[in-house]
């Protein structure tokens, strides 16, 4: 519910008589108009029953525009992170306790960025702390006028991918429902300390993933394990604290050793020696790809497999970093969160920025959006493999198989053993063998074209692979002996006369009667002369009549078809469909004729 006062903008009610959201271009005071609660019309009553009107107390106003500041990278302005939400909640609860009988108005300045951050902060508070469902948290601000400004990435290029408040709210809600985010074990002091560049620049994205910027320390080459230099590396937390390493690197090593980090994944070029991590018993692996680019899918799948094993088998956390711990780091962590918990791309980007501002930059946003389906597909495949493995009984040693089974045993094909699909190959073989997408040409623009060949990949109901005609013996014999000037209709009439002349009153005991049907595929071509198909016009007055069969043992149904000079050729055109309907050009039409 939203109220408004002239010249003061819109005031949105979140909790009746408790919390309101507003924006002012000046600091509000007791004289600022406040439309809640709305005055109810009074019913007529006796004078002695009228009570003296109670004085309505003015609400309490507070803002965080000058206290909770977003540290932007370039043109980004939000959303505010989880530390801001924690401080907002503490301050709001203090105001509620001190003003039990007064409404509280959380307001911001009237500029678009301040309004968006304030509304997003309140909606996330309702979801994460008050446990509201997302639709209820979004309902009060859904029809805000003017609408709230969407958020953008931290890159230096023009923003071409946006996130709105709904994405942030649903991302936070999904993380809470999956146990990925919560304030029960959240330490504000630790969060605000280690997010600073001079203190390590790292944040926990989830209980199993930590994102951090690359430490920088010389030398950068790995130190051999059997060398004296490796033995001198700090191997305990106390040795790390007493070492002469830079403070950010020291904080990283100490925090990782005490918080159960089991794997460090480096995505950028070498700026430190990995031996400092391995000396503490922390595995280290390089999965380097170019800054600002998107990782190849095989690398992503390898990362997901390693991370899943580290989390579920070794019960350790994973720390991922690139140069700044934002773009490339967000790609891999976001891919795993989509894979495991079913985030959408917008939700996971918004949630990661809620935990560590600036994550996922530029085209990496589109990359996550385009590949989110593949990540979920990998999860379903892995779950199905696990279920099938559990359902499979204990393996039994097989006995000696017969010779015919051994001869038909399936062997592993050689590398690239399948035949390449040529541009002009055998029709039947191309359809009988599986199609390898890697060998197909790239899709070309334009509309698909109809083809005379029935492709079993697109027409699964075709009866023969090559679309060949199947006709009876009499028809083939007649076609071979037919003169080039004889039309198809004359051939059918001559066959009918032959069958009538050969009828007998009783079946011969030495002969057997065979009834069979022939499937004929006929292709019709529409001529340019529209007057030759007058019976197929939509405005035809009379529908085609059902042909009457003769009362003989060898009856054949034949429809009356007008002869055309253009159809009198030596080439066989198949059997004309009795219904008078003509299939479109290039689309075979099957006609079932009773012989």
Swiss-Prot record:
Q: Where is the composition biased (Polar residues)?
A: 502-526
Its annotated compartments are:
Nucleus; Cytoplasm; Cell septum
Does Cell cycle count among this protein's keywords? yes
Q: Name one GO biological process term.
A: rDNA chromatin condensation
Alphabetized InterPro entries for the sequence: CDC14_C, DSPn, Dual-sp_phosphatase_cat-dom, Prot-tyrosine_phosphatase-like, PTP, Tyr_Pase_AS, Tyr_Pase_cat, Tyr_Pase_dom
Catalytic residues in the record: 322 (phosphocysteine intermediate)
Look up the record and report any one GO term of the cellular component aspect.
RENT complex
Q: State the Gene3D superfamilies in the record.
A: Protein tyrosine phosphatase superfamily (3.90.190.10)
Report the SMART domains cross-referenced here.
DSPc (SM00195), PTPc_motif (SM00404)
Report the PANTHER family cross-referenced here: TYROSINE SPECIFIC PROTEIN PHOSPHATASE AND DUAL SPECIFICITY PROTEIN PHOSPHATASE
Q: Which family does it belong to?
A: Belongs to the protein-tyrosine phosphatase family. Non-receptor class CDC14 subfamily.
What name does the UniProt record give this protein? Tyrosine-protein phosphatase cdcA
Which classification does the entry list for the species? Eukaryota, Fungi, Dikarya, Ascomycota, Pezizomycotina
